[in-house]
UniProtKB/Swiss-Prot annotation:
DNA ligase that catalyzes the formation of phosphodiester linkages between 5'-phosphoryl and 3'-hydroxyl groups in double-stranded DNA using NAD as a coenzyme and as the energy source for the reaction. It is essential for DNA replication and repair of damaged DNA. NAD(+) binds at D35, A36, Q37, Y38, D39, S84, L85, E115, R138, E178, K294, K318. Zn(2+) binds at C412, C415, C430, C435. This is DNA ligase. GO terms for biological process: DNA repair; DNA replication. HAMAP family: DNA_ligase_A. Disulfide bonds: none annotated. It comes from Myxococcus xanthus (strain DK1622). PROSITE patterns: BRCT, DNA_LIGASE_N1, DNA_LIGASE_N2. One of its GO terms (cellular component) is cytosol. Pfam families: BRCT (PF00533), DNA_ligase_aden (PF01653), DNA_ligase_OB (PF03120), DNA_ligase_ZBD (PF03119), HHH_2 (PF12826), HHH_5 (PF14520), Nlig-Ia (PF22745). CDD domains: BRCT_DNA_ligase_like, LIGANc. One of its GO terms (molecular function) is metal ion binding.
Length: 672
């Protein structure tokens, strides 16, 4: 065996190993190796492909980052039509569905399979000789859009099939499924967008659909998409299944992720499954809007066939919506720190899902036009789980006779500067360089917990400082005197002293916090950390080329251009120099080489008395550790403060080492 043959054999072995570890981590949430071990395997494969370029195949795990942007999506004709399910909304509909099935099949009772109905985007995937070669959206059911490059970026989707139990992989296999975003990932995505000054997504489905249909796969790669598969198209080499459950287990054996399911005997069994699903819907890690009910027996399915574009053998039993109707009292425009003009509906307060809702974002002009929300309208408002409230629909029959469409402003409502659309045409921004509304939001961000952490500098104080003209730039904050502060509303001696002390403390900061505090568009906390590691001093960014910035971890071409433009702008350079001259001293990141936290995954839970959660996170990261948001078998330590909840319980179940606050502080001191 020559060198190339050895390299090819090792590459195939690495494909299999990495696919196995991806499945354990992204599907089962039960990893067998550490991040460092996984990265070592990936680097070995990358090195092999660099030495032997012909080994870099489209299904290689190294190709998940996404290729070049496309001008438009190609069309894909589906091998078999992608049909959609009919909906039912009450028990009567379920009873009628079961009666029809029993009558057509001629049996007194039917076995069903019940699955959570994901609120995602339907897809078709094609594998040839076990390698993923094409993926498409449903489209009109006959023809969909080719989104292969974007689907390659989804970590839970295997690029190659490595079956268990010596199952033979068909030469051609087409499977159907759904792309979605998990709740925790959606929450993190919106938090990141908020950090970066970008408009929030309304719900996980919108985020998933928008992410999958990005023309630039690198944008999709930055979004935390997941996938479940639930169907495969009959073909040569594909087993003939007796039941749907048998089919699901076959997909699972091939290494494809499947949703949870439950077998139900007859109508009463489905009712019990529905009641259990409805009761436990908020416990699931993803949003569901109902339960899919399918006949389990494959022969019965063939006999039942389909009507129009829906199968007779399946139905979507929708959950009652968590929606309430209320009145739109007004529509206003909110100006963000990056100048984005966001329409906001001010509502007559109403309780939705146990929470009082008085405002709902309308996201942007296109969304406002699509829904045609107007002042005085009666609307339905939905709030699902942790998702921000959104207006679902307008009750047109109750629309006032004198209502008029909302006129989106051509100028900023605060500074009257011209408002222009972004390159993608979705967001309208104020162009005013000295817009007071932007300045207020920028100061709020500058003082926020992850930035300079200036305690006592909140929304109202920021607005007062700007409106009185005392603060026109960040550096002006450090020139404030106690006498200046005492002239402001609701500011006494003690409050003024505390704020001055907080401002003084904030001067001793980190480069990561400092870069994040500047409010650069697209730059959240994680990107600020990566930039700080690459450029320990801000002045280095003044001299950095676009290529230098593009080499920073997780910085894509669009973000790199924005960052480069920001630091080339003389006004921004002047603002940074003014802050440094005012005494702000951003410390360069320290790289830990030893100690109990190096390379460890730590989860923080509960309230701590000796420091804030953010301070604890910084201390762990400064010592070479990584703070994760959830507990898994990969977690090395869980630091449990007061009133620790589900994370502590999971750590106990998994046998993860648990530290109380005192033990954690002692570990920090021994590794100071």
């Amino acid at each position: 065996m020559d060198d190339f043959q050895k390299a090819a054999a090792r590459a195939r072995e690495l494909h299999r190993e990495l696919a196995h570890h991806n499945y354990r981590y992204y599907v089962l949430d039960s990893p067998e190796v550490s991040d460092a071990q996984y990265d070592k395997l990936m680097r070995e494969l990358q090195d092999l492909e660099a030495k032997h370029p012909s080994l870099q195949t489209p299904d290689s795990p190294t190709q998940r980052v996404g290729g070049a942007a496309a001008e438009e999506f190609g069309e894909v004709v589906h091998r078999a039509p992608m049909i959609s399910l009919a909906n039912i909304f009450e028990d009567q509909g379920l009873t009628e569905f079961d009666e029809r099935i029993r009558k057509l099949v001629g049996l007194p009772g039917i076995a069903y399979v019940c699955e959570p109905k994901l609120d995602g985007l339907a897809i078709a995937l094609r594998y040839e000789k076990g390698a993923f070669v094409q993926g498409a959206t449903r489209g009109d059911g006959t023809t969909g859009e080719d989104v292969t490059s974007n689907l390659r970026t989804i970590r839970s989707l295997p690029m190659s099939l490595f079956p268990q139990d010596d199952v033979k992989v068909p030469d051609v296999l087409e499977v159907r499924g759904e792309v979605f975003i998990r709740k925790k990932d959606f929450q993190k995505l919106n938090e990141k967008r908020e950090e970066e000054g970008e408009p929030l997504f309304a719900n996980p489905r919108n985020a998933a659909a928008g992410s999958l249909r990005q023309l630039d796969p690198r944008m999709t790669a930055a979004r935390p998409l997941s996938v479940f598969l639930y169907e495969c198209v009959p073909g040569e080499g594909v087993p003939v299944f007796k039941t749907h459950i048998e089919k699901l287990e076959y997909l699972k054996t091939l290494g494809l992720p499947i949703n949870q399911y439950r077998r139900a005997e007859g109508l009463e069994g489905v009712r019990q499954a529905y009641d259990a699903s409805l009761k436990g819907r908020h416990e699931l890690p993803f949003e569901v809007d109902g339960m899919v009910v399918k006949v389990d027996d494959e022969d019965q399915r063939k006999r039942l066939g389909q009507v129009s574009k829906s199968p007779r053998w399946a139905v979507a039993y929708k959950f009652p919506p968590e929606e309430e109707s209320t009145e739109v009292m007004d529509i206003g425009i909110q100006v963000g720190r990056t100048g984005a003009l966001t329409p906001v509906a001010h509502l007559k307060p109403v309780k939705v899902g146990g929470v009082t809702v008085a405002r709902a974002t309308l996201h942007n002009e296109d969304e406002l036009r699509r829904k045609d929300v107007r002042k005085g309208d009666t609307v339905f408002v939905r709030r699902a789980g942790d998702v921000i409230p959104e207006i679902v629909s307008v009750v047109l029959s109750k629309r006032p006779a004198d209502s008029a469409p909302f006129e989106f402003p051509k100028h900023c409502p605060v500074c009257d500067a011209v408002a222009t659309k972004d390159e993608d045409g979705a967001i309208i921004r104020c162009t005013g360089a000295s817009c007071p509304a932007q300045l207020v939001e920028k100061i709020r961000h500058f003082a926020s917990r992850l930035a300079m952490d200036i305690e006592g500098l909140g929304d109202k104080l920021a607005a007062q400082l700007v409106s009185t003209g005392r603060v026109k730039a960040f550096a002006d904050l450090y020139a404030l005197t106690k006498e200046d502060l005492l002239t402001l509303e609701r500011m006494g001696d003690k409050s003024a002293d505390n704020l001055i002390a907080s401002l003084e403390r904030s001067k001793q900061t980190t480069q990561r916090r400092f870069l994040y505090s500047l409010g650069i568009r697209h730059v959240g906390d994680a990107t600020a950390k990566a930039l700080a590691e690459a450029f320990p001093r801000s002045e280095m960014l003044f001299e950095a080329s676009l290529e230098d910035i593009s080499r920073v971890k997780d910085v894509g071409p669009i973000m790199a251009q924005v960052i480069h433009t920001f630091f080339q702008e003389p006004q921004n350079q002047e603002a940074i120099r003014a802050l440094l001259a005012a005494g702000v001293q951003p410390a360069a990141p320290q790289v830990a080489t030893g100690g109990p936290f190096v390379g460890k995954s730590v989860v923080l839970t509960g309230a701590m008395t000796g420091m804030t959660r953010e301070q604890a996170k910084e201390e762990v990261e400064r010592r070479g550790g990584k703070v994760a948001g959830s507990v898994s078998r990969k977690t090395d330590f869980v630091v449990a403060g007061e009133d620790a909840g589900s994370k502590l319980k999971k750590a106990q179940e998994l046998g993860v080492r648990i530290l109380d606050e005192q033990a954690f502080l002692q570990m920090l001191q021994t590794n100071a």
